[in-house]
A protein has these predicted regions:
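Short polar/charged helix/loop
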Residues: 1-108
């Protein structure tokens, strides 16, 4: 299954989520950010590639819908409601990601 994680800058939350799946046998994972200065800025190709898209906040889903409505048709978009207060790799962020993703990704 192909998963895409989205936050604002693709430096802390979405990148941490992507790293959780390094070498996972059942998931291919990428991450991107919605803002112009993002490490990797989300593009139509990311959305076309992904089967399921996880956004950290509602504003990320809103931005994707504004910019990529056609590419999102038929896609599952899940809002995780994880605030922008955790640095990359933070243990609390990892625990929160695991907790929120467990309902959506049974093989995590």
């Amino acid at each position: 299954m192909r998963l895409l994680f989205i936050c604002s800058q693709n430096k802390w939350r979405s990148l941490t989520a992507e790293r959780l799946f390094d070498d996972h046998p059942h998931y291919e994972v990428r991450s991107a950010g919605t803002e112009p200065g993002a490490r990797v800025r989300v593009a139509a190709g990311h959305l076309g590639w992904a089967e399921t898209i996880f956004v950290m906040e509602r504003r990320h889903a809103d931005r994707l819908r504004e910019k990529f409505a056609a590419e999102l048709r038929g896609k599952t978009v899940v809002t995780l409601r994880i605030p922008d207060k955790y640095p990359f790799g933070d243990e609390r962020l990892i625990a929160l990601l695991r907790e929120k993703l467990a309902a959506h990704l049974p093989l995590l």
